[in-house]
Amino acid sequence: MLNIFSLICICLHSTLYSSSFFLAKLPEAYAFLNPIVDFMPVIPLLFFLLAFVWQAAVSFR
């Protein structure tokens, strides 16, 4: 359990303190991918929530 908590903290730390990474712009040739790139940081959180939904579906066995 501690390892999972540590991993979450590391992910949040790197996300919160790398704001300059989010301010970078894609090259013009890839500008059409902007909506997808904006959504990409949220994808790991969706997998995290999916784990809880899955466990609820099997009654937290």
Swiss-Prot record:
Which residues are connected by disulfide bridges in this protein?
none
**Which Gene Ontology BP annotations are present?**
photosynthesis
Major subcellular site: plastid
Q: Spell out the GO cellular component terms annotated for this protein, sorted alphabetically and separated by semicolons.
A: chloroplast thylakoid membrane; photosystem II reaction center
Q: How does it sit in the membrane?
A: Single-pass membrane protein
Which Pfam families does its entry note?
PsbK
What HAMAP family does the annotation carry?
A: PSII_PsbK
Concerning its family, UniProt says: Belongs to the PsbK family.
According to the record's subunit comment, the protein's assembly and interactions are: PSII is composed of 1 copy each of membrane proteins PsbA, PsbB, PsbC, PsbD, PsbE, PsbF, PsbH, PsbI, PsbJ, PsbK, PsbL, PsbM, PsbT, PsbX, PsbY, PsbZ, Psb30/Ycf12, at least 3 peripheral proteins of the oxygen-evolving complex and a large number of cofactors. It forms dimeric complexes.
The name of this protein is: Photosystem II reaction center protein K
Q: Which gene encodes it?
A: psbK
